[in-house]
Amino acid sequence: RLSGGNQQKVIISRWLLATEKILILDEPTRGIYVKTKADIYHLIDRLTAEGLSVIFISSEMPELINMCDRIVVMNHGRTTGVLSREEFTQERIMELSTKEL
């Protein structure tokens, strides 16, 4: 039986066997050990360096700030802001995530 982190790695590896150019990851590191998170982060970095686009969905702001080139913030299913890496702060993300449209 595989641990949760190893299960995540296997799932990502299966996706990589496909010839897709966009990978959508929804909370890919939730509930796994720090070491395994680091392994997944390194894998994602390698994939993006090779030209794969990754949509990374996470509720952990530090994770988003460290992993993303751009963050799209939503509230109740609507986009409230798009931030480039230079604009990332936890305060700005929180402000946009609670913004009413």
Model-assigned labels for residue ranges:
Residues R1-L101:
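Glycine-rich phosphate-binding loops of nucleotide-dependent enzymes
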